[in-house]
Swiss-Prot record:
Its cofactor is Zn(2+). The active site is at D82. The gene is gatY. Coiled coil: none annotated. It catalyses: D-tagatofuranose 1,6-bisphosphate = D-glyceraldehyde 3-phosphate + dihydroxyacetone phosphate. GO terms for molecular function: tagatose-bisphosphate aldolase activity; zinc ion binding. Binds 1 zinc ion per subunit. One of its GO terms (biological process) is galactitol catabolic process. It holds the Pfam family F_bP_aldolase. Forms a complex with GatZ. Zn(2+) binds at H83, H180, H208. Pathway: Carbohydrate metabolism; D-tagatose 6-phosphate degradation; D-glyceraldehyde 3-phosphate and glycerone phosphate from D-tagatose 6-phosphate: step 2/2. This is D-tagatose-1,6-bisphosphate aldolase subunit GatY. The lineage of its organism: Bacteria, Pseudomonadati, Pseudomonadota, Gammaproteobacteria, Enterobacterales. CDD domains: TBP_aldolase_IIB.
Amino acid sequence: MYVVSTKQMLNNAQRGGYAVPAFNIHNLETMQVVVETAANLHAPVIIAGTPGTFTHAGIENLLALVSAMAKQYHHLLAIHLDHHTKFDDIAQKVRSGVRSVMIDASHLPFAQNISRVKEVVDFCHRFDVSVEAELGQLGGQEDDVQVNEADALYTNPVQAREFAEATGIDSLAVAIGTAHGMYASAPALDFSRLENIRQWVNLPLVLHGASGLSTKDIQQTIKLGICKINVATELKNSFSQALKNYLTEHPEATDPRDYLQSAKSAMRDVVSKVIADCGCEGRA
């Protein structure tokens, strides 16, 4: 079986001092880029999809595609529910075969966040499904969820331990100054906060909003305990811009098999760089 949960992947990363990248995909071509690049570099990767992606492509279609590509390349893959908020939606996808879940109740008060997450954990662990949850709240937009910068909240290290112990989660997404989307200027990450969280919580830690971060910042977060790096916007931007450029230069182009190649190539460069930044090449 080539489609797995993220639990062992992230535990291996925690022991090995590297991070596993979670790449948000949107269609066949973006999935091809991620899987082919990961297989060529022998790197562990996570195929992530927001609720919008699963609605667009269909859960059964995505699962079948991931399974087929994992088997084709003899490469273990995890398909992961990114920023899912509804219990019934998560339960349906788990019953369909998903083995890695992020339940995002970070917008709720602390006690309600715990309650919502624990409900999902109790259900998912019956199916050996790994669960990630978020404490604190990132600014920016992910799918249809918009969080103003003023409403973004950093993770409280002491609360993080209570949250992890009360919910039984397998990994914790932290808020230390990143945001969803691309940055107009380099963000000021709170490395001391991350170091403090690591002292209070022994679970694999997750960094969302990594698109556009410098190699130096990514590698510093890994040294301080980040085991999973989420990248979405940077992939979409590189793919879309290359496609726009190609069609502008070749207005006569009508065959997707031709004009999508430049988009895939541009995205492949981003995937390769993120894998290198995460230090996970050769770790699969």
